[in-house]
């Protein structure tokens, strides 16, 4: 029966007989409950949609409020000697986050006089989360909630539900994406991710120590470098203290612009800040925080010695970590002592910020090497770099003198939205693209994120759409959304945009034709964010996978009988039996034996 192996035939059978969109979610082992009665008669179905059940389970295992699967279609490809049939489906999953009042904006009578304090407090809460030491939840056992009876609750899922409400979770939400990342990492990745975070923290403490350093600092607090040029361990030991609110509160007298530069320089590691703005250290250029640079060692400029021995020192540092390396590298060649002219040495000494830049480049190179050691599953940093976009937006606002209640509110709201978008897209990427068994067989065709801001009565304030096609759609979406939201922060409180401002905004967000209505973008830019009570996030994506055909003659015979009986009932305008109806197996229709499906073995005759 050729119809069994064609897209049109499978579509007809799926619609009227098997209902594959539901049947594929059942246990289809021979004799299982789902196979009893019509139309399977204790046997698996004649087709199997590879990956469909896993796709649905992936969506069910996440904190989506609603899930829909539409446009289940079958397409056929016929080439000389081969025939394939694929299934495709559009998945739409969504959930709503409560964008209620953030505690920094609650009960503030004189907002203008406390604006700087609020801005620095908001920055401090965020940077503490971005540089906090990562520690995955550990332990075994079950969790029981008083209002959920005897049903066990996963702690991770419970926390994600908690993070949906900004009015309830407040600053606890900051760093949610990174915390979930390390929660899903293996033992080796945990060590590497914690080391990377420790290096960023140490570098931030190092550069912040300079601008916070007061005259008359005790000599004992200084750490002399280059420590035989193997200074990384001493660097981490000296600056490994976690960044906390107490540390940052001591910077109240420091210009916010300078603090933001330090944050961007640390958080953007191992990449260079896009505007290449490095914080400028106090006093001489040969001084870095509480590190004191010796002018020379054995007649050589110290930064030059550090630079020449950088690779060797980094390799030794990684080798000492309690992890097995993915591949052993060739040790760098020994440093060749070359004579350096006195003039060259003098030039080396007076390069502005040479010491600080060498420290950052060393830390950046080490972080890059550690990221290469991560497993493929943990290496997807593209979902966790969005914080840099928002710190840079704050830096631009500070430079423009445009820090006000509206820009701060939007900064917090969009940061909150980005945490959720990053967490969800990373989850989908891990399950649908990074899981090799699924990704080898099922293809991601396109992905879309829809953001609907709603007021307290549920009305839509504005709606944004981002689309991407191809296998890398999830990561490309994250990059676009992060850049888009960060660029729109500067428009808060400016009302409707002028013609030239519209062109500038479209350029800043890298607008694409498939990014929704331009009027919605302009409405988003001009809206007063105090009107927004909640934000609905919808994640839509289309996947395509193969359909496999049974080669068991018994299943083929049952299918022939079922299809013939169903066709007869349809021709007579009679209803078809309900699934699992207890009716006898219809007789085998008369006529010649159907040809074998592609690849099937002929039946043995005795």
Curated annotation (Swiss-Prot):
Q: List the residue(s) that the UniProt entry marks as the site Cleavage.
A: 140-141, 289-290
Q: Does the keyword Signal apply?
A: no
Q: What keywords sit in the KW lines?
A: Covalent protein-DNA linkage, DNA replication, DNA-binding, Host nucleus, Phosphoprotein, Viral DNA replication
- What are the O-(5'-phospho-DNA)-serine sites (modified residues) in this protein? 515
Changes after translation: Preterminal protein is used to replicate viral genome, upon genomic encapsidation it is processed first into iTP and finally into TP by adenovirus protease.
- In this chain, composition skew of type Pro residues spans 584-600
Q: Which Pfam families match?
A: Adeno_terminal
Q: GO cellular component terms? A: host cell nuclear matrix
Disordered: region residues = 573-606
Q: Give the coiled coil ranges.
A: none
Question: Which GO biological process categories is it annotated with?
Answer: DNA replication; viral DNA strand displacement replication
Indicate the principal place this protein occupies in or around the cell: host cell
Cell compartment(s), UniProt: Host nucleus matrix
The question of whether NADP is a record keyword is answered with no
Which molecular-function annotations from GO does this UniProt entry contain?
A: double-stranded DNA binding; single-stranded DNA binding
Q: List site positions: Priming of strand displacement replication by covalently linking the first nucleotide of the new DNA chain.
A: 515
> Motif Nuclear localization signal, which positions?
320-329
The cross-references to InterPro entries, in alphabetical order and at most eight, read: Adeno_preterminal
Q: What does this protein do?
A: Protein covalently bound to the viral DNA that acts as a primer for viral genomic replication by DNA strand displacement. Assembles on the viral origin of replication in an initiation complex with viral polymerase, DBP, host NFIA and host POU2F1/OCT1. The terminal protein stimulates the template activity over 20 fold compared to protein-free templates. Neo-synthesized viral genomes are linked to two preterminal proteins, one for each 5' end.
Subunit structure as annotated in this protein's UniProt entry = Heterodimer with the polymerase; this heterodimer binds to bp 9 to 18 of the genome. Interacts with host POU2F1; POU2F1 binds to the auxiliary sequences in the inverted terminal repeats and tethers the pTP-POL heterodimer to the origin DNA thereby participating in the assembly of the pre-initiation complex (POL-TP-DBP-NFIA-POU2F1).
- Family membership, please give it: Belongs to the adenoviridae terminal protein family.
Q: What is this protein called?
A: Preterminal protein
């Amino acid at each position: 029966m050729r119809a069994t192996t064609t897209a049109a035939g499978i579509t007809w059978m799926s619609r009227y007989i098997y209902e594959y969109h539901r049947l594929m979610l059942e246990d289809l082992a021979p004799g299982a409950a789902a196979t009893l009665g019509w139309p399977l008669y204790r046997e698996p179905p004649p087709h199997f949609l590879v990956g469909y059940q896993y796709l649905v389970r992936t969506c069910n295992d996440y904190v989506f409020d609603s899930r829909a699967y539409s446009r289940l279609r079958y397409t056929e490809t016929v080439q000389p000697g081969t025939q394939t049939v694929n299934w495709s489906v559009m998945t739409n999953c969504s959930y709503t986050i409560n964008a209620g009042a953030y505690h920094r904006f609650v009960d503030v009578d004189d907002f203008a006089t406390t604006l700087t304090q609020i801005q620095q407090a908001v920055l401090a809460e965020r940077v503490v989360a971005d540089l906090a030491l990562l520690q995955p939840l550990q332990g075994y056992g079950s969790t029981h909630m008083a209002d959920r009876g005897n049903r066990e609750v996963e702690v991770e899922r419970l926390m994600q539900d908690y993070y949906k409400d900004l009015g309830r979770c407040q600053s606890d939400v900051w760093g949610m994406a990174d915390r979930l990342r390390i929660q899903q990492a293996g033992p080796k990745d945990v060590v590497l991710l914690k080391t990377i975070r420790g290096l960023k923290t140490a570098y931030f403490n190092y550069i912040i120590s300079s601008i916070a350093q007061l005259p008359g600092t005790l000599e004992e607090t200084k750490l002399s470098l280059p420590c035989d040029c193997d200074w990384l361990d001493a660097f981490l030991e000296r600056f490994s203290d976690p960044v906390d609110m107490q540390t940052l509160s001591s910077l109240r007298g420091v210009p916010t612009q300078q603090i933001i530069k330090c944050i961007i320089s640390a958080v953007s590691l191992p990449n260079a800040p896009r505007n290449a703005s490095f914080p400028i250290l106090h006093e001489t250029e040969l001084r870095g925080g509480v590190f004191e640079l010796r002018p020379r060692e054995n007649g050589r400029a110290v930064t030059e010695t550090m630079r020449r021995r950088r690779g060797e020192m980094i390799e030794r540092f990684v080798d000492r970590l309690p992890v097995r390396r993915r591949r052993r590298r060739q040790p760098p060649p020994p440093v060749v002592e070359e004579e350096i002219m006195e003039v060259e040495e003098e030039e080396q000494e007076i390069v502005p910020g040479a010491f600080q830049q060498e420290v950052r480049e060393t830390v950046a190179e080490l972080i890059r090497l550690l990221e290469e050691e991560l497993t493929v599953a943990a290496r997807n940093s593209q979902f966790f770099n969005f914080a840099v976009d928002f710190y840079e937006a704050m830096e631009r606002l500070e430079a423009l003198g445009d820090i006000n209640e509206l820009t701060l509110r939007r900064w917090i709201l969009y940061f909150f939205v980005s945490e959720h978008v990053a967490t969800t897209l990373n989850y989908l990427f891990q399950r649908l693209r990074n899981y090799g068994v699924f990704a080898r067989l099922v293809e991601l065709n396109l992905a879309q994120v829809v953001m609907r801001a709603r007021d307290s009565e549920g009305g839509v304030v504005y709606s944004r759409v981002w689309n991407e096609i191809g296998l890398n759609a999830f990561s490309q979406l994250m990059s676009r959304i992060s850049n888009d939201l960060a660029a729109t922060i500067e428009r808060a409180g400016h009302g409707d945009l002028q013609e030239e401002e519209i062109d500038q905004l479209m350029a800043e967000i890298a607008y694409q034709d498939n990014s929704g209505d331009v009027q919605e973008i302009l409405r988003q830019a001009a809206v007063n964010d105090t009107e927004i009570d909640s934000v609905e996030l919808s994640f839509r994506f289309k996947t395509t996978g193969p359909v496999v055909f049974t080669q068991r003659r018994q299943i083929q015979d049952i299918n022939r009988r079922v299809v013939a009986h169903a066709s007869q009932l349809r021709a007579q305008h009679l209803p078809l039996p309900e699934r699992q109806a207890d009716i006898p197996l219809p007789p085998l229709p008369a006529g010649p034996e159907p040809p074998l499906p592609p690849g099937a073995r002929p039946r043995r005759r005795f």
